[in-house]
A protein has these predicted regions:
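Conserved acidic residues
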Residues: 45, 134, 161
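Conserved beta-strand elements of the Class I
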Residues: 21-22, 48, 81-83, 104, ...
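Short secondary-structure boundary segments
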Residues: 25, 51, 140, 166-168
C-alpha cells in the first residue's frame, strides 16, 4: 500500500490493485487563505469525509467519480471494508464543533485508521469498536483536535505500529495549532521521509511503534 500526504488531514491511499482512497479533501484557500496547501490534483475511487468543514469535505476537488463515504455505516467498496466510528470534534460531546467520524479501512491486509478531527481521548467502547490498528493517521496539532499528549495516548490504546501525524502547523497552514515537533518529542522512534509518500506492506510492519513524518505537496 502506498500512502501519500496531500496536506492537512488529506491522504491518498493506494492499494496494490490500484484502488485509490482520498481522506478528508480540503478546499485550498479556504478560511480566508489559512488553508494554503496546493489544490488537490489527484483522482480517487473512494473519498472519506470525517465531518463537514471546508478543510475536510471538499469532495469536488477530487478527480474522477469517487464514491463518497460519510457517517458510521459499515460498508465494502471495491473489495475494501470500511468501518466508521462516530466520535466528536471537541471535548464537549460535539457542542462546540459537532461530530467526527473515524474511518477504519483494511487495505492489502493492513488495518488503517484515519482519525479525522478527533477532539477527545477515546472511550473504551470507541477503542473496542476500532480494534487494533496497524497504521494510524492522527491529528497532533491540538486546539481544534487532540494534541500531542492525547495523540500519543490514542496511538497506544489502539496498538498502532506506524503512526503518521497530520493536522499540525506548517508553513502552508495559518491555523493556531502546534507543530509536529511537539508530538515527536514524546515519541521514541521517528522516521522523517524525504518526500510525500511511503510504501508499507503487511510483512514489513515494525515490531515496535514508529512515527513516520511525511512532507506535503
Amino acid at each position: 500500500m502506498k500512502i501519500k500526504w496531500l496536506g492537512h488531514a488529506s491522504f491518498l491511499l493506494e492499494s496494490k490493485s490500484g484502488t485509490k482512497i482520498i481522506t478528508d479533501p480540503f478546499e485550498a484557500g479556504s478560511y480566508d487563505g489559512a488553508v494554503g496547501y496546493a489544490p488537490i490534483s489527484e483522482s480517487a475511487d473512494i473519498v472519506t469525509v470525517s465531518h463537514d468543514h471546508a478543510d475536510h469535505n471538499a469532495v469536488d476537488s477530487v478527480g474522477g467519480t469517487p464514491e463518497v463515504v460519510r457517517g458510521s455505516e459499515d460498508r465494502q467498496i471495491d473489495g475494501i471494508p470500511i468501518r466508521g466510528v462516530s466520535t466528536f470534534h471537541d471535548e464537549s460531546k460535539g457542542q462546540d464543533r459537532g461530530r467526527n467520524t473515524i474511518y477504519l479501512m483494511e487495505i492489502d491486509g493492513i488495518r488503517v485508521g484515519h482519525l479525522g478531527d478527533l477532539g477527545h481521548r477515546l472511550s473504551d467502547d470507541e477503542a473496542a469498536a476500532l480494534g487494533k490498528i496497524d497504521v494510524l493517521l492522527t491529528p497532533v496539532g491540538g486546539y481544534y483536535t487532540i494534541g500531542p499528549d492525547e495523540a500519543k495516548e490514542v496511538a497506544e490504546s489502539l496498538g498502532a505500529k506506524v503512526i503518521i501525524p497530520m493536522h499540525f502547523k506548517t508553513e502552508a497552514l495559518g491555523f493556531p495549532i502546534q507543530p509536529v515537533d511537539d508530538f515527536l518529542r514524546l515519541m521514541e522512534r521517528v522516521e522523517r521521509v524525504e518526500g510525500t509518500s511511503v510504501e508499507i506492506s503487511a510483512d514489513d510492519l515494525p515490531a515496535e511503534p514508529k512515527v513516520v513524518v511525511l512532507e506535503y505537496e
